[in-house]
Amino acid sequence: MSAPSATDFDQDFSAVGTSAGLRRVWELAAPDLPPEVQPFSFVSAALLRHVARALRLSPGQTLADLGCGRGGPGLWLARETGVSLVGVDFSPVAIDEATRRAALFGVTAKARFVVGDLTDTALPDAHADAAVSIDAFHFAASPAAAAAEARRILRPAGRLVLTNWQPEVPGDARLPARLRIDWPRLLRGAGFGDVGVEAQPEWHDLYARVYRVAIDLGDPRDDSGLARLQDEARRRLPEAGLTRRVVVTATAP
């Protein structure tokens, strides 16, 4: 299966911002999540706090959000940690939305967003103290190239934190290739060290719960954002038991 295109994601992001159904999904599935986050991913406030700790950020540092989408999780992290934020996404619609939404988090002066690819961010070498990627790395045309790009933009000892999935059974052929990634092997191959993979049941429970809540809301009528999530849920719920949600951490040399 080929990687989704920027045009595919433009359509998705256009639907998200106006979707009352998606807002309702998050109210029911993750009531602890601040409403302004409006994620295009499977995060709770507890998971974002875990990511913030793993990034080991200090106020005044720079965080790169790779595959930032509409910006919510990265903007939350910037607000909570006092860092500057640069978000990168290949969807111009997402970048426009993220730029606009920075004001909701009170970080307009410290956040900027640029159109770029996970494998070619156009950021300078050693630009960021840390990098985060929320449910995005597996969409790269080449996850290995994305890992190499993340290392390039990180300063020495910079932290990389990803949220994603891994198979319960390594190499499970029932799953698409992007859900079978061996994260430690991938990141070590890009030169990272101190690679860790953590899974907690509540992270995977949230993933499945978002899909079930979306389906239970019933007929989306003219809500294209909810309709898209329901279609995705029907495709992915049958394979949910084959994967686990993980937070992957690594350190640049």
Where are these predicted regions, by residue range?
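N-terminal, positively charged/glycine-rich alpha-helical extensions of SAM-dependent methyltransferases
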Residues: 1-32
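Conserved alpha-helix/loop element of class I SAM-dependent methyltransferases that forms part
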Residues: 41-59
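Class I SAM-dependent methyltransferase SAM/SAH-binding core
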Residues: 62-66, 70-120
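A short acidic, Gly/Pro-enriched loop at the edge of an enzyme's catalytic core
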Residues: 119-130
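A short SAM/SAH-binding and catalytic strip from SAM-dependent methyltransferases
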Residues: 130-142
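A short glycine-rich, Lys/Arg-flanked "PGG" loop and its adjoining helix->strand segment in the class I
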Residues: 144-156
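Conserved beta-strand signature within the Rossmann-like core of class I S-adenosyl-L-methionine
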Residues: 158-164
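Conserved Class I S-adenosyl-L-methionine
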Residues: 196-253
